[in-house]
């Protein structure tokens, strides 16, 4: 069997509603941007294949709803994620303050050694910026996780954010892991459905 990729990484985008998670995903996966804001309902995902260090890596990127009412649905997607990108809005202090809460969610639901990346989005809105780059960088450094400011609107650092995440995961997994597009990675999303029981509303 000759698979079309060497690695399959599942990434998760989390953060408050309205910080631009869907826009980041659209920019990275389709290189498009839209001003019209529609809240993600539950979970959406896109796939993009990248080349890194001579290897083909398939990124399965899950975009989660930020609203509290979807928290129980989205929490099941933490399981099996190789990397989680926590997004806040640089023009919204509350979304930055809530990063700690999102990191607690990761500790609660994700695997222990999952890779994390902190992203401050909407960096193009310089006049409205309230979260200082240095503050966020120091916070990320204290946790030992990478940090980037991005703009889905003008594409600043969007590519770099996802590539950084992929490189970190690849480094952690080492040369032998997840190669050959092994099937065990693909059954992750079929298991969390059962415990929920009688529907989600």
Swiss-Prot record:
The modification Cysteine methyl ester is found at residue 201. A motif (Switch 2) lies at residues 65-80. GTP binds at residues 17-23, 33-36, 39-40, 66, 121-122, 124, 151-153. Changing residue 81 to D: Abolishes interaction with REP1/CHM. No prenylation. Lowers GDP/GTP ratio by half. Changing residue 144 to N: No effect on prenylation. Regulated by guanine nucleotide exchange factors (GEFs) which promote the exchange of bound GDP for free GTP. Regulated by GTPase activating proteins (GAPs) including TBC1D20 which increases the GTP hydrolysis activity. Inhibited by GDP dissociation inhibitors (GDIs). A motif (Switch 1) lies at residues 30-45. Gene3D superfamilies: P-loop containing nucleotide triphosphate hydrolases. Its cofactor is Mg(2+). It catalyses: GTP + H2O = GDP + phosphate + H(+). The modification N-acetylmethionine is found at residue 1. SMART domains: ARF, RAB, RAN, RAS, RHO. The keyword Oxidoreductase does not apply. Its EC number is 3.6.5.2. A lipid is attached at residues 200-201 (S-geranylgeranyl cysteine). Prenylated; by GGTase II, only after interaction of the substrate with Rab escort protein 1 (REP1). GO terms for cellular component: cytosol; endomembrane system; endoplasmic reticulum membrane; endoplasmic reticulum-Golgi intermediate compartment membrane; extracellular exosome; Golgi apparatus; Golgi membrane; perinuclear region of cytoplasm. Residues 64-83 are annotated as: Switch 2 region. It is an enzyme of class 3 (hydrolase). The modification (Microbial infection) O-AMP-tyrosine is found at residue 77. Belongs to the small GTPase superfamily. Rab family. Switch 1, switch 2 and the interswitch regions are characteristic of Rab GTPases and mediate the interactions with Rab downstream effectors. The switch regions undergo conformational changes upon nucleotide binding which drives interaction with specific sets of effector proteins, with most effectors only binding to GTP-bound Rab. The small GTPases Rab are key regulators of intracellular membrane trafficking, from the formation of transport vesicles to their fusion with membranes. Rabs cycle between an inactive GDP-bound form and an active GTP-bound form that is able to recruit to membranes different set of downstream effectors directly responsible for vesicle formation, movement, tethering and fusion. Plays a role in the initial events of the autophagic vacuole development which take place at specialized regions of the endoplasmic reticulum. Rab-1B binds GTP and GDP and possesses low intrinsic GTPase activity. This is Ras-related protein Rab-1B. It comes from Homo sapiens. The lineage of its organism: Eukaryota, Metazoa, Chordata, Craniata, Vertebrata.
């Amino acid at each position: 069997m000759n698979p079309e990729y060497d690695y399959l990484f599942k990434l998760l985008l989390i953060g408050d509603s309205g910080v631009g998670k869907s826009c980041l995903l659209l920019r990275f996966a389709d290189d498009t941007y839209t001003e019209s804001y529609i809240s993600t309902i539950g979970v959406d995902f896109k796939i993009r294949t990248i080349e890194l260090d001579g290897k083909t890596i398939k990124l399965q990127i899950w975009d989660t709803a930020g609203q509290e009412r979807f928290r129980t649905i989205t929490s099941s997607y933490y399981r099996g994620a190789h990397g989680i990108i926590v997004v806040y809005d640089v023009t919204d202090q509350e979304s930055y303050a809530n990063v700690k809460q999102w990191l607690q969610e990761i500790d609660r639901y994700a695997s222990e050694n999952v890779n994390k990346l902190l992203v401050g989005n909407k960096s193009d809105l310089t006049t409205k910026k309230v979260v200082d780059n240095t503050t966020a960088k120091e916070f990320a450094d204290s946790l030992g996780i990478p940090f980037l400011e991005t703009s889905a609107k003008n594409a600043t650092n969007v590519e770099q954010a996802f590539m950084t995440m992929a490189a970190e995961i690849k480094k952690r997994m080492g040369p032998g892991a997840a190669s050959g597009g092994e099937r065990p990675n693909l059954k992750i999303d079929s298991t969390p459905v059962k415990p929920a029981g009688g529907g989600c509303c």
